[in-house]
Curated annotation (Swiss-Prot):
The gene is tin-9.2. Belongs to the small Tim family. This is Mitochondrial import inner membrane translocase subunit Tim10B. It comes from Caenorhabditis elegans. The keyword Mitochondrion applies. Pfam families: zf-Tim10_DDP. Residues 73-111 are annotated as: Disordered. GO terms for molecular function: metal ion binding. Residues 94-105 have a biased composition (Low complexity).
Length: 111
């Protein structure tokens, strides 16, 4: 890797790290009277980090599986164009739209 790629990779890592730290701190830190975490806070942070890392790993696996399909779905497009035009496929097809006749509601003024 060249230097620019190393810097970009470091920047991405630090962004993920900072986001993870902020989420877990906001979710777990409750006692600001001490300079160390309480036992409950430490446990919460550990569970939070484990959960976030698991979610990140699952997300990356799905991304690694789906990205090539999206990139080369349309063979005539370049990978950049394919990414821009790729739309996520809905899990459930949308129902057919059917016209519905409506009857206007007339409100009576009661005085």
């Amino acid at each position: 890797m060249n230097t620019i790629q190393n810097i970009q990779q470091l920047r991405e890592f630090l962004t993920v790290y900072n986001t993870l730290s902020e989420r877990c701190f906001n979710a777990c830190a409750r006692d600001y009277t001490t300079s160390t975490l309480t036992k409950d806070e430490g446990s919460c942070v550990s569970q939070c980090i484990d959960k976030q890392m698991l979610v990140n790993r699952r997300f990356m696996l799905v991304f690694a599986e789906q990205a090539p399909k999206a990139l080369f779905k349309q063979g005539e497009q370049s990978p950049t164009e394919a990414i821009k035009s790729a739309k996520p496929e809905p899990a459930v097809p949308a129902p057919e739209a059917t016209p519905v006749e409506t009857t206007p509601v007339i409100e009576e003024n009661k005085q």
